């Protein structure tokens, strides 16, 4: 087998859809026993700030949990395509049918609320974390 250059690998990855990339990442995690999740820093609270409220979260993850009404699947697929530009019909259908799936990560509270409202109105169940 001929060795691929980094440039060839990057080019091949660039041609894949979002859904295909997600599957590739899962396969790599399983094969190499690693996770693609970013490390989480643990911050110890100071003694003087014992009563201080936790900082308000600024980035959210929007997850499609499923369908509230299976008869509205087509509407949810259309909204998923609006949320994820460039997502093909087949990939959007697979994403909806494979729920729960992450729709968007690291979005603002306002954007997360807009996505939830649109998907919920179309017949989907959404979780913001």
Curated annotation (Swiss-Prot):
UniProt entry tagged with the keyword Coiled coil = no
What UniProt keywords are attached to this protein's entry? Ribonucleoprotein, Ribosomal protein
State if Ribonucleoprotein is listed as a keyword: yes
Q: Name one GO molecular function term.
A: structural constituent of ribosome
Q: One GO CC term of this entry?
A: cytosolic large ribosomal subunit
Under the heading Gene3D superfamilies, the entry gives: 3.30.1390.10, Single helix bin (1.20.5.710)
What transmembrane ranges does the database entry give? none
CDD domains for this protein: Ribosomal_L7_L12
Q: Matching NCBIfam families, A to Z?
A: L12 (TIGR00855)
Task: Give the similarity note.
Answer: Belongs to the bacterial ribosomal protein bL12 family.
* Its biological purpose: Forms part of the ribosomal stalk which helps the ribosome interact with GTP-bound translation factors. Is thus essential for accurate translation.
How would you summarize the oligomeric state and partners of this protein?
Homodimer. Part of the ribosomal stalk of the 50S ribosomal subunit. Forms a multimeric L10(L12)X complex, where L10 forms an elongated spine to which 2 to 4 L12 dimers bind in a sequential fashion. Binds GTP-bound translation factors.
Q: Under which name does UniProt file this protein?
A: Large ribosomal subunit protein bL12
